[in-house]
Amino acid sequence: MTRVALTSAVNLAKKLSDAGIRNQAVLKAISQTPREMFLDNALAHKAYENTALPIGQGQTISQPYIVARMTELLLSNMPKKVLEVGTGSGYQAAILAQLVPELCTIERIKGLQIQARQRLKRLDLHNVSFKYGDGWQGWSNRSPFDAIMVTAAAATVPEALLSQLVDGGVLVLPVGENTQQLMRITRHRERFSSENIETVKFVPLVNGELA
């Protein structure tokens, strides 16, 4: 990172701390990650604003507060193996890869997946496995997972993802069609408990693959 980018990332982490993010490991990862790398050059000057930004193909890079909040929720059971559904720009994956030993991430849009893979390689993050495919179905041959994060809004909770959690595993996702609820769902053997965390706004989780 350049000195200017590092200063901007550190300042962003301070703003997120003031906004209520308490996990110091999450804040450290935010402060060390060059968000401008995950944006087109035309939007790089907005990289450290606490706002969602377009990345093409009708997708967005999430607001940094939401990235930090979802990561904080995901880490509640100290997961070792995590699945991310919706790689997008790769920014959320870059944060997670600094915090968990093993990350698997799925993206249905091929162009975004290729770009994200290149970005994480440039950041020397090598504990990440990438898949081009339908996130609704999860990644069954790499399951079970200690935690799963979905970075797009599902109209209903995907059953396939619930089935791929370990006992005690956590699923963090937005649920709803317009304004959504960010939820944390915990598996207790064959039953599940859920918590509504806060109101959020995400692009929809879409079935299938897109070249």
UniProtKB/Swiss-Prot annotation:
List UniProt keywords, sorted A-Z. Cytoplasm, Methyltransferase, S-adenosyl-L-methionine, Transferase
Q: Which InterPro entries match?
A: PCMT (IPR000682), SAM-dependent_MTases_sf (IPR029063)
Catalytic reaction equation(s): [protein]-L-isoaspartate + S-adenosyl-L-methionine = [protein]-L-isoaspartate alpha-methyl ester + S-adenosyl-L-homocysteine
Q: Which GO terms describe its biological process?
A: methylation; protein modification process; protein repair
Here the disulfide bonds are none
Annotated active site residues, numbered on this chain, are 62
Compartment list: Cytoplasm
Known function: Catalyzes the methyl esterification of L-isoaspartyl residues in peptides and proteins that result from spontaneous decomposition of normal L-aspartyl and L-asparaginyl residues. It plays a role in the repair and/or degradation of damaged proteins.
> Which PANTHER family does the UniProt entry name for this protein?
PROTEIN-L-ISOASPARTATE O-METHYLTRANSFERASE (PTHR11579), PROTEIN-L-ISOASPARTATE(D-ASPARTATE) O-METHYLTRANSFERASE (PTHR11579:SF0)
The entry assigns this protein to a family as follows: Belongs to the methyltransferase superfamily. L-isoaspartyl/D-aspartyl protein methyltransferase family.
Q: What is this protein called in UniProt?
A: Protein-L-isoaspartate O-methyltransferase
What is the primary gene name for this protein?
Answer: pcm
